[in-house]
């Protein structure tokens, strides 16, 4: 099984790439974590928010594997604890299907793309900088894996 993060936005600050890379590198070979960036629609074109999200959704769809479990990151998604995410990761692994976590752009994800999701997760009830999602999600997935393996990284 593979974990794939498909995220809208390119040219992130170096700290984002370093943070994501650190936790992606720690993931085991049997559960690799990869990132695919898709171009955000320029906000200066005069298009409506809906049109921009639709254009980004088309790019996201093109980046998705043919078969995968789609998990949308959404402010209205399930709010999981670390232990609950670990159980979810365990269930994903048992299912054997690759899992793609989808991160929208500044305006979020189109309703049509959201409708294709198998599930929705929320990282936090706080409003966070968009760039912070990648390293935060990578760390959360690594921590969930460490819980499942009784690795000392996570402490209760």
UniProtKB/Swiss-Prot annotation:
Keywords: Cytoplasm, Methyltransferase, rRNA processing, S-adenosyl-L-methionine, Transferase. GO terms for molecular function: rRNA (pseudouridine-N3-)-methyltransferase activity. This is Ribosomal RNA large subunit methyltransferase H. Homodimer. The keyword Transmembrane does not apply. Belongs to the RNA methyltransferase RlmH family. S-adenosyl-L-methionine binds at residues 73, 104, 123-128. PANTHER family: METHYLTRANSFERASE (PTHR33603), RIBOSOMAL RNA LARGE SUBUNIT METHYLTRANSFERASE H (PTHR33603:SF1). It comes from Aromatoleum aromaticum (strain DSM 19018 / LMG 30748 / EbN1) (Azoarcus sp. (strain EbN1)). GO terms for cellular component: cytoplasm. It holds the Pfam family SPOUT_MTase.
